[in-house]
Amino acid sequence: MSGLEIEFTGFLTDSLSLDMNLGFLDSEVTSDYEALDNVDIYQYFFGEEDLRYGLRENVKGNQLAKTPEFTADITIKYETNLPSGNSLTTVAQYVKRGKFQQRVNNNPVVDSIRAYTIGNLTTSIGFSDSLAVDFMVLNVTDEAGVNSSMTDVFGVAATGLELIPPRQIMTRLRYSF
């Protein structure tokens, strides 16, 4: 496995900043290793061990589990003081998670997880050091994506998907003490 992670924070002006985190990853099984894919073997039971054993596969060359080749989180933030004396902070965030394989078996039926891209927007008004209100739109484009999946965790030959949250529009009141 090899990769590169880049973290960058830049102040573009007195009130505008850019925060960028990028990850590049190349993951691959480089040695011979035989594994059983429980998705393929679930129908064989006691007395059929030889059939199960015959279904083993060499995973050399397969992508490691849960290792997207590319991830990005780019955030631009604008901060200023309003004429009223209140503070204003606006944040726009871009998040990209590349495709990956859920398990080292790389079974195309259950292991391929698609890439997704989402955007988040937040505006905050600070009335004092202890009181603020936030207006948020998360997953602005209402992207339907899969964060993760789990295959055959309980031996029932099923795959469960963990979805990313849909678009959310929220208001939050913050009080610090």
Regions found by a protein language model. Name each.
Residues 1-103:
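Gram-negative outer-membrane beta-barrel transporters
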